[in-house]
């Protein structure tokens, strides 16, 4: 059985991967999620995903031998601005106000390190999300749920956040944080397939 490592502590990514019956270790990366404003959002997402996977691979050392490390990084992009995770209520309010009644883009970079064949694959997925028009009162009420604080763009598409999302164009799971179709396409290039239970 292949040793699989998810380089993330995101409950959403963990749940998405668990549904395929894969046994995997959870080893969150210690990478600071620093955005390079000179790079396009998809490049930032891919760079951060790669840094996360590489950091975990290095830290595991000998125990990473022949393992498969999966990492991801999600970025929200609107009107030329990358929105990260809000660190307080003021930032969350600013972000939610900014995406209210508009379409924004969600990019998730995905990286897979397959030590058994010494390969690193990096790719990204893109989806468009339409948020309803929210009053200041609605924004504050949503912030009080506590959902915005560990999410890029200050919302979750599941939970209470589903009540502010009008529609999604593209991969839904990309918005959750792990684009499953893209992930499996990358795994197939390495000779694995989630549909066949090959991990």
From Swiss-Prot:
Record keywords, A-Z: Cytoplasm, Hydrolase, Nucleotide metabolism
Name of this chain's protein: dTTP/UTP pyrophosphatase
GO BP term, example: nucleotide metabolic process
One Gene Ontology cellular component annotation held by this UniProt entry: cytoplasm
Similarity comment text for this entry: Belongs to the Maf family. YhdE subfamily.
Subcellular location: Cytoplasm
Function: Nucleoside triphosphate pyrophosphatase that hydrolyzes dTTP and UTP. May have a dual role in cell division arrest and in preventing the incorporation of modified nucleotides into cellular nucleic acids.
Leading EC class: hydrolase
Domain of life: Bacteria
Active site location: 73 (proton acceptor)
């Amino acid at each position: 059985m292949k040793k699989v490592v998810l380089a993330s502590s995101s409950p959403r990514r963990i749940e998405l991967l668990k549904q395929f019956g894969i046994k995997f270790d959870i080893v969150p990366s210690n990478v600071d999620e620093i955005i390079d404003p000179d790079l396009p959002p998809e490049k930032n997402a891919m760079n951060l995903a790669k840094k996360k996977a590489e950091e975990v691979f290095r830290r595991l050392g000998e125990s990473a031998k022949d393992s498969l490390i999966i990492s991801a990084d999600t970025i929200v992009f609107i009107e030329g601005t990358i929105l990260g995770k809000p660190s307080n209520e003021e930032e969350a309010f600013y972000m939610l106000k900014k995406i209210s009644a508009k379409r924004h883009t969600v990019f998730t970079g995905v990286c897979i390190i397959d030590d058994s064949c010494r390969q690193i694959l990096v790719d990204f997925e893109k989806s468009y999300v339409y948020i309803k028009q929210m009053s200041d009162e609605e924004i504050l009420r949503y912030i009080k749920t506590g959902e915005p604080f560990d999410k890029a763009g200050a919302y979750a598409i599941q939970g209470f956040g589903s009540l502010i999302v009008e529609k999604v164009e593209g991969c839904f799971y990309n918005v959750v944080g792990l684009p499953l179709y893209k992930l499996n396409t990358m795994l197939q290039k390495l000779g694995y397939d989630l549909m066949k239970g090959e991990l």
